[in-house]
Amino acid sequence: MKVLMINGSPHVKGNTRIALDEMVKIFEKEGIDTEIIHVGHQDIRGCIACMTCKKGKNQCVFDDLVNQVAPKFEQCDGFVVGTPVYYGSANSTLISFLTRLFYSTSFDKTMKVGASVVVARRGGISSTYDEINKFFAISGMPIASTQYWGRTQRRSSMALSIGTV
C-alpha cells in the first residue's frame, strides 16, 4: 500500500510539513509506504481550459510537476493534501496544481482515499478543508474523515522565536 502526500506550503520545513511528517510516522507503523512531494514553492500555472489533456494524451499541455506527479497519483492507494491557510483558503499554487492534476488525469479515482490536512494560525480552517475535499468528492473518492476539520495548531510562539521547530 502506498500513500502519496502533497505539501502545499511554500515552506519546505514549515508547519504543514510537520503535520505531514506526523502522519508518515503513523503510516510507517502500519507498514504503509509514503512519499511527500513539495509543490508549494513551485512555479505552477493554472489551468487554461485548452482541453489538450482530453485530446488523447492524458497529460497537461504544461510539462511541469503536474505531469511528473500524475503517474504516482494513479499508482497510489491514498492521497493526502496538506496546505496552510492564506486569506481563508489554500495556497493558490496548490490549487493550480490540484486543478490541473485532477482534470488532466482520466483514470478511475473512486477507490483512492483522499485526506486533507489544514494548518492555520487564525480563521479559514473549515473553508480550506472543504476546498481541498471538493477535489476528492467531485472525483468520487472516499474521504478520510477526522475530528475538527483535520486542522493543526500553529507552532508555539517560543518555538517560532528560537526557530527550532
Regions found by a protein language model. Name each.
Residues 1, 24, 28-29, 142-165:
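Glycine-rich phosphate/pyrophosphate-binding loop and the adjoining helix
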Residues 2-32:
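N-terminal beta1-alpha1 ligand-phosphate binding loop
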Residues 10-11, 41, 121:
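Short, glycine/serine-rich, charged loops/turns that create anion-binding
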Residues 32-42:
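A short beta-strand-loop structural module common to alpha/beta enzyme folds
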Residues 42-73:
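Cysteine-cluster motifs in flexible loop/terminal segments that predominantly coordinate metals
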Residues 51-55, 99, 133, 162-163:
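Short, hinge-like loop/turn segments at secondary-structure boundaries
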